[in-house]
Regions:
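Short, compositionally biased terminal leader/tail segments enriched in small/polar residues
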Residues: 2-52, 58-61
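Extreme N-terminal segment that seeds HTH/winged-HTH DNA-binding domains in transcriptional regulators
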Residues: 43-97
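Short, hydrophobic-biased segments on the C-terminal half of alpha helices
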Residues: 107-108
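Key DNA-contact positions within bacterial/archaeal DNA-binding proteins
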Residues: 101
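Mid-protein regulatory/catalytic core that forms ligand/cofactor-binding pockets
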Residues: 168-282
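A short, conserved structural fragment
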Residues: 112-119
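Basic, amphipathic "hinge/linker" alpha-helix immediately C-terminal to the N-terminal HTH DNA-binding motif
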Residues: 122-141
């Protein structure tokens, strides 16, 4: 599990550059304590947090930021199930922007590791171990979102992407402390249930409550404006920075009642003087309740 150290570097093909200050000191295989659970990919951009290595702390630089590929895939399958979408390798490729062969190789490794099963019709099923792992990752992700919004004050539209980093490095002790610190939240800032809270001692109903998509509600009505209560924002929409910022400025956040009317570009959504124009595709990922 993450956070355990003292593993050896044997049989690890991953290389990282160890630095002290700004100078490269030496090159070493990535220690097993970092790769125990899954293989790691990289995304160009940021500096990786310091890592315990050989009893010392160093700044670890790869060509970018370490991302746990297995955890990304597990969380994506979990998301698809929440949304009622059949988990297929093609859907994972779309969500993560990866090639078909890359996804197939990763899924094959996950199947070998006992995390998923590829059924006869090619949809992916989480094993008991895979579901427990995916639930843990999503729980950490949504608790990180709560902390980033309620304590750190990160802008709403930036929170999801940042939480995608935190989910891979948060220990169980830290997630438990965050949950207690925030008065035991049960939903994320986007209205999605935090799964697996029973493992932290909660006695709550973690099921996703049924709520139609905004696009479906509007599609059944005439051209007259309607009022709806926003219940939640689906995970795929949370990556759309500009759309999320526009929704926030318009007051169209979970728990808010907004007015919705048709527009040439799709729909106008807002709770006051400012409105956000969203496409019907975006409205597919906004769960609402007519009022």
């Amino acid at each position: 599990m993450p956070g355990t150290c003292g593993g050896t570097t044997s049989r690890c093909p991953y290389i990282l550059w160890i630095t002290r200050g700004e100078n490269v000191t030496y090159v070493t295989p990535l220690p097993r304590c970092v790769t125990e659970m899954a293989q790691w990919g990289s995304v160009a951009g940021d500096k990786v947090p310091s890592c315990a290595l050989g009893g010392l702390r160093h700044n670890v630089h790869v060509s970018g930021e370490l991302i746990d590929t297995t955890e990304m895939y597990l969380r994506t399958i979990f998301e698809l199930e929440e949304e009622g979408t059949v988990p297929l390798r093609a859907r994972i490729a779309e969500r993560l922007g990866q090639s078909g062969p890359t996804v197939s190789q990763t899924v094959a490794r996950m199947e070998r590791d006992g995390l998923v099963i590829v059924s006869g019709d090619r949809h992916l099923e989480l094993t008991d171990a895979g579901r427990a792992y995916a639930t843990s990752v999503m729980r950490k992700h949504r608790l990180a979102e709560c902390l980033l919004v309620n304590v750190i004050g990160l802008p709403w539209e930036d929170v999801h992407v940042e939480a995608c980093r935190w989910e891979h490095v948060m220990s169980e002790a830290v997630e438990r402390r965050i949950w207690e610190l925030l008065d035991q939240p049960t939903t994320s800032p986007y209205g999605n249930p935090i799964p697996g809270l029973a493992e932290l001692g909660a006695a709550v109903d973690e099921s996703m409550s049924a709520a139609p998509a905004l696009s479906a509600v509007v599609g059944r009505l005439d051209a007259s404006p309607i009022r709806v209560l926003i219940r939640r924002i689906d995970e795929p929409l949370q990556t759309e920075h500009d759309v999320m910022a526009a929704l926030r400025r318009a007051g169209a956040t979970p728990g808010s009642t907004v007015k919705v009317s048709r527009s040439p570009g799709g729909l106008l959504v807002g709770s006051g003087g400012e409105y956000a124009e969203v496409s019907l595709g975006v409205a597919d990922h906004i769960a609402v309740e007519p009022v």
